[in-house]
Amino acid sequence: MDRLGGISAIGGTPVVRLARLAGEGCAEVWVKMEAANPTGSYKDRMALAMIEAAEADGRLRPGQLVVEYTGGSTGSSLALVCAVKGYPLRIVSSDAFADEKIATMRAFGAEVELIPSPEGITPGLIPSMMRRAAEIAAQTGAFATDQFHNTDMVDGYRRLGEELLGQLPGPPPVSAFCSYVGTAGCFLGASRALAAALPQLHRVVVEPAESAVLSGGPPGTHHIEGGGIGHRPPQLHPADYDEVMAIPEARAFQTARQAARTEGIFSGPSTGANLAAAIDIARRLGPGHRVVTVQVDSGLKYLAGQLYS
């Protein structure tokens, strides 16, 4: 399939090794720089995969309305893809998420409906957004991408793992992969591609300590966008991972700031959580190993919030 416009630039992102954050006596830590995608987020991969798969099997008709619930980056990515392909897009989001993300969706032409949540990302917020998007689809006949239940989005991230295999052939081998999970699409797609070539890969899911449901804790309110949704992601099962790491919100924010100031990696809080987890794993493994994680998105999406204020 020929791809024109901005969607032709999705994927093929660079990978860099941390120079200072991990310290001495640790495994190498490598970061896939997904902010290099057109909207500054790895969600461009899943948005393109969901739309193109629906086009291919007829679920999405030319000019049909598309609807999605999103905290922002998926919405921005869908807005980009729909703009290039000529689909109107309606987004259900919330004021709990970064203003920059909402503005980006609208800049690409999406219609955005916001659900108020002054406390932040609460356990009930995502379910309420999901219900509203389902209502819109039922009322209008829109195609609902429904990211949490859409298996095509996992396929969109498989290429990320395949790219890593080509970029980091070793030695040393990639010993561990960690990723903050919302839909868990990036974790599932990338880890499956990596594990197919590296059967001993240690697979680590990352979540906020304030809503550590996968660790057996209660759902809670937090401010690390892109995950910690208050329940297990529908497509993520215990057999898919080897370990769960719960990163406190304050540490995720601190690590994101440190990465900007010491590594030149300018990102959001979810990347901070990824880096914190990767550093802990690297310290545990020691020299002779590689730990890989992902820069989720660009810090430009968070300049109006508390992260860099």
Locate the predicted segments by residue.
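PLP-dependent amino-acid enzyme catalytic core
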Residues: 1-309
